[in-house]
Design a protein with these regions (language model features):
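A conserved beta-strand-loop-helix scaffold within acyl/acetyltransferase catalytic domains
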Residues: 1-51, 102-127, 134-238
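Active-site/acyl-donor-binding loops of N-acyltransferases
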Residues: 29, 41-42, 46-47, 113-135, ...
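Aromatic (often tryptophan-rich) hydrophobic motifs at membrane interfaces
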Residues: 31, 62-72, 80-88, 196-298
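Conserved acyl-donor/pantetheine-binding loop and adjacent beta-alpha core of acyl/acetyltransferases
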Residues: 46-65
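Short, polar/flexible loop-turn hinges at active-site or ligand-entry regions and domain interfaces
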Residues: 69-76, 133-137
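A conditional alpha-helix N-cap/helix-loop micro-motif detector
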Residues: 76-80, 184
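Divalent metal-dependent hydrolysis catalytic cores, especially in the metallo-beta-lactamase
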Residues: 94-102
């Protein structure tokens, strides 16, 4: 493999190596070179999925962002080549659907995606600014009082670095996402490998040594990205584990000097979304961008084109 570019964890050699050691996941990296130098690279993650409904076994590919490019590279010329290469490769592998999210600009790559049969779906993303105000300055007096009250009750947090803590956190994630069919929780190996990276933190929220919440945050390009989060909201409703988990993620991001905390998944693009409304309560800013989807069965793409005419 040629000497790859550095600067975006989601398209890095480090993440590629973590993913290739994780059962149930296959990473693919498209690389563009010019005069034996890498000028662009794009990482896509292929997940092996199971479903109670047809298709019972399928694969789903996800790319986070448009890739990474050399400072002097012609991104507008290289991006279509990388996108086409990965799309053709995944199509040959009968990948059920491909998804691109976290695009830096709403209209970036619009023409290229359309040419390859992708469908744009308007998706609301949320981020909290940490550089202009402290996180607590965006909270209501009621929220601040509640957080102080929960801390007095004994709720604490720590980074999950030991195998035991990571196992308990992984069990929490699996139970939390069990009925959320669109979300995929990687094998425990993934979180073990992430815990050794300087770009990632797995954090657990505890009460009397019981894990009631947790999250995985990626620190990348001066920002924080909340990749996974889970909490036992119903079991410990009196302890508000959902609020304590999101609040801790915001506090940690601010301590790490992140400019923003981005929620990588604020829920489905429905008019009424309780989770989205919940995280907006922490002072976040909603921004509508496109997520791009391409399904292997052409009939699904045709249906989506009809439903999401832009």
């Amino acid at each position: 493999m040629p000497h790859l570019l550095e600067g975006d964890f989601f398209h890095s050699l480090e993440l590629f190596q973590i993913l290739e050691k994780t059962p149930g996941i296959t990473p693919f990296m498209a690389v563009a070179t010019l005069e034996n130098k890498v000028v662009g690279q794009m990482l896509v993650i292929l997940y092996q999925r199971k479903s109670l409904f047809p298709p019972y076994l399928y694969t789903h590919a996800h790319a986070y962002g448009e890739g990474l490019y050399a400072p002097d590279a012609e991104q507008n010329a290289i991006f279509p080549l990388l996108l086409r290469s990965l799309t053709i490769h995944l199509h040959k592998r009968l990948c059920f659907y491909i998804e691109f999210s976290r695009m830096s600009k709403k209209m970036l790559g619009y023409r290229e995606f359309r040419k390859l049969g992708y469908v744009p779906i308007a998706w609301q993303e949320i981020h909290n600014s940490l550089h202009s105000k402290l996180p607590q300055e965006r909270l209501s007096d009621k929220q601040i009082a509640m957080i102080k009250r929960m801390k007095k009750k004994g709720i604490s947090c720590r980074e999950a670095t030991s195998p035991e803590d990571i196992h308990r956190y992984h069990q929490l994630l699996k139970n939390y996402y069990r009925l959320k069919l669109r979300r995929f929780v990687p094998d425990e190996t993934f979180f073990q490998k992430l815990s050794t990276s300087s770009n990632a933190r797995n954090v657990i929220i505890t009460y009397k040594d019981k894990v009631i919440g947790g999250y995985t945050c990626i620190y990348n390009q001066g920002n924080a990205f909340l990749w996974f989060s889970a909490f036992k909201r119903k079991t410990y409703i009196h302890l508000h584990p959902d609020t304590m988990t999101i609040w801790q993620a915001l506090s940690d991001a601010q301590e790490q000097d992140a400019q923003h905390l981005h929620f990588m998944d604020a829920g489905l693009p429905l008019k009424s979304n309780l989770y989205r409304e919940f995280i907006l309560g922490f002072g976040g800013k909603p921004v509508t961008k496109f997520r791009w989807f391409r399904f292997y069965p052409k009939v699904i793409n045709l249906l989506l084109h009809w439903l999401y005419k832009d």
